[in-house]
Amino acid sequence: MAWPCITRACCIARFWNQLDKADIAVPLVFTKYSEATEQPLPAQIPRSAAAPIDTQPGGDARAAGGGDAAPGPARPGTAPHGSPPADSVMRHDYKPWKVQRPEPSCKPKSEYQPSDTPFEKETQYQKDFRAWPIPKRGDHPWIPKAGPSPVLGPERGSPEKAAQEKRRKKEEEAEADEEHPKAARPGDAREKGRQRGDEAGGQEGRGRAAADALNRQIKEEVVAAGVSSSYRNEFRPWIDVKPVKAIKAKAQYKPPEEKMTHETSYSAQFKGETSKPAPADNKFLERRRIRTLYSEPYKEPPKVEKPSVKPSKPKKTTTSHKPLKKAKDKQIASGRAAKKKSAETSNTAKPEDKEKSKEMNNKLAEAKE
């Protein structure tokens, strides 16, 4: 067992004899497992050296002379009372490991071994795709230009081309054909006679001819080498292959020609109870309908015509006094109208009535006094 639970009382009480006491102790306390299992005797008996397995290098000396350790000279860190070193947990009682001969490592040495042949400075990509010469500003070789003299235009680049080919082939290889220098000789004479025409024509034709000559030279170098680029060798276009005809996939869903009914199978199978006719012969259902207060779900209750009497609405008691104000305004308006009418009637009354009314008023005033 490895590190049992020794904090609970149940684990301490149960199977105590079956536990390995060396697992419970701190690992560095015991140098041998036999010291944990065997109980120390009062008289130290010399143990056999082959039985235990030492965990520290200094265990052989202690195992061989276990009984003689006490009378011998004590170690320079042990207690003065001469306790055996097996009981000590001090650091100086355990000698460190001393490895005199280290084992040879199986890991290979990572030493740089230079190759016999030097590396190429130019990569395959640089070989296949070389830089084109930069033409003059505004001179695009892919745009055909109409020269000043259309008759002498195509012949203008031939002497310069021949001269450049001659120089290149002299520098590169001596195995060039003899036709090139022969073709170059009449070109030299033409050049001398044509220099005067070039001066009049301008310098545009010269730059154009030089760019064309360089482009042809690069193309000829590639063809003369006989080796196209590795990318062209690996990825070549298909020849004599007909283009594939586009295939239109058939539609998997075919819509029905006739008109679709928007009724699902669920709605067709489970319809409402209103469509079921009520059985008229069943007296039990009629009695039950009379007894119960509820009407059947598939029978509509008979509609009773209610008398059309409008219930009197209770007056709303609101905090706002708008309806009262309206009533007061109506009363004031009616009073004003009555006064106006009385004034109009009084104006039309006779002056005799006015005098009578004055007399009556005077009599009343005298009576009050």
Curated annotation (Swiss-Prot):
Segments for region (Mn 3): 228-251
Annotated stretches, region: Disordered: 41-213, 251-369
Annotated GO biological process: cytoskeleton-dependent intracellular transport; dendrite morphogenesis; lysosome localization; microtubule cytoskeleton organization; positive regulation of axonogenesis; regulation of microtubule cytoskeleton organization
GO molecular function: calmodulin binding; microtubule binding
Chain intervals for the UniProt region annotation (Mn 2): 122-145
Region called Mn 1, residue ranges: 87-110
A GO cellular component entry from the record: dendrite
Keyword NADP (UniProt): no
Keyword match Cytoplasm: yes
Biased amino acid composition, Basic residues: 312-328
Low complexity bias: start-end ranges: 70-80
Positions with biased composition (Basic and acidic residues): 89-110, 118-142, 179-209, 297-308, 350-369
Subcellular localization(s) per the UniProt record: Cytoplasm, Cytoskeleton
Record keywords: Cytoplasm, Cytoskeleton, Microtubule, Transport
Function: Involved in microtubule stabilization in many cell types, including neuronal cells. Specifically has microtubule cold stabilizing activity. Involved in dendrite morphogenesis and maintenance by regulating lysosomal trafficking.
Family label: Belongs to the STOP family.
The protein's name in its UniProt record: Microtubule-associated protein 6 homolog
Species annotation: Gallus gallus
Upper classification of the organism: Eukaryota, Metazoa, Chordata, Craniata, Vertebrata
Gene that encodes it: MAP6
